[in-house]
């Protein structure tokens, strides 16, 4: 079976694991949030890996960097949703800090990837 380039990215693998953990986390949110916060956070966390996958199919490094940047911004969107979940007492402060740490790790790796893509497009 062929492995696509995005599947080899450590940051994509982290985003994949993070998505699963967020899906499991939101299962304990109140049912009235199904079409609100749950839907929003699932969409944003899914977009992290999706942007990396889509960007890997682009030809130029500048285009790849654009999609990596979009993955970065959706990671921050996910952070915002986690802050809302904490504010609404859907998650504890400890849970929030655990997920925030994972987000920081992902954003650091996304920044590094984006910088390498930008540098490769500007020799």
Can you describe what each PLM-predicted range is?
Residues 1-123:
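Amphipathic alpha-helical assembly/interaction segments
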């Amino acid at each position: 079976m062929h492995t696509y380039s995005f599947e080899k990215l450590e940051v994509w693998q982290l985003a994949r694991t993070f998505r699963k953990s967020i899906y499991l986390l939101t299962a304990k949110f109140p049912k009235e949030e199904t079409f609100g916060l749950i839907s929003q956070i699932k969409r944003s966390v899914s977009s992290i890996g999706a942007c990396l996958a889509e960007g890997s199919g682009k030809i130029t490094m500048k285009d790849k960097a654009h999609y990596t940047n979009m993955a970065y911004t959706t990671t921050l969107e996910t952070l915002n949703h986690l802050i809302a979940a904490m504010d609404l007492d859907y998650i504890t402060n400890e849970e929030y800090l655990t997920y925030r740490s994972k987000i920081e790790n992902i954003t650091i790796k996304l920044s590094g990837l984006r910088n390498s893509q930008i540098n490769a497009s500007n020799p």
